[in-house]
């Protein structure tokens, strides 16, 4: 993703290893010499028309980023889902993705449920890698969206769950994806809220661990060099801290705050254990 600029009196030449290299180079020129800020749209920046811009001759090398995958998730996306900003429903999302690129980001969760199907191709076309919400492993369609009349039980409908995962892999296998693995209940809750058979941490962790291994293997079968992540969020963090989860060694662990900036597990109803969400337990 690094780039090199060569500036002479006649021209500017950009060298880059991939598409994002050129995007970052153009954004650097845009901000440094035209004054366009990363959040220009969100801050209502007033643009200044320039008749002349002087860019010094010479060579500029960008620095390598210290963090390989850098991005964000658009939480509470319903707040912009029906906003057009006077242009179109897609436009605010395009501005979200542009701001991320201008900040040096390269990875995004482009919405959830129906939104993820709509905006993932746009984010990808704009140069971003895609990953998935923790309630939608592999970016698969929610079970109750696909099968609204069935009980969303993995034990009862294993083949249907795995069919949704297979479809998601096939749909995205040619894109740049960081594959999120895991298992939560429908509606973004612990899966055992609707299945009393899983009444201990050991039983819950065993099922989630087995599912993650299955998802991992399904992706690896089609994409040998795939990159994976999982979210240590809520009940998943608790199970991990208790030693009840077995996660493949090369899966990136995403440590989540509680939604209020504290690195502890998020409260769910009256359950608020405040388990540390700092790597190493600090």
Language model regions located:
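Structural recognition of the beta-strand scaffold that forms the well-ordered cores
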Residues: 12-14, 70-74, 107-109, 130-132, ...
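Contiguous, structured surface segment used for ligand recognition
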Residues: 1-64
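Gly/Pro-rich turn-and-neighbor structural signature
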Residues: 47-49, 53-55, 117-120, 124-125, ...
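The substrate-binding groove and active-site-proximal loops of carbohydrate-active enzymes
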Residues: 13-16, 75-90, 103-111, 144-162, ...
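An acidic-aromatic substrate-binding cleft motif
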Residues: 37-107
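Short helix/loop capping segments that flank catalytic or ligand/cofactor-binding pockets
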Residues: 22-25, 81-83, 140-141, 191, ...
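Catalytic domains of carbohydrate-active enzymes, especially glycoside hydrolases
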Residues: 88-118, 122-125, 129-131, 174
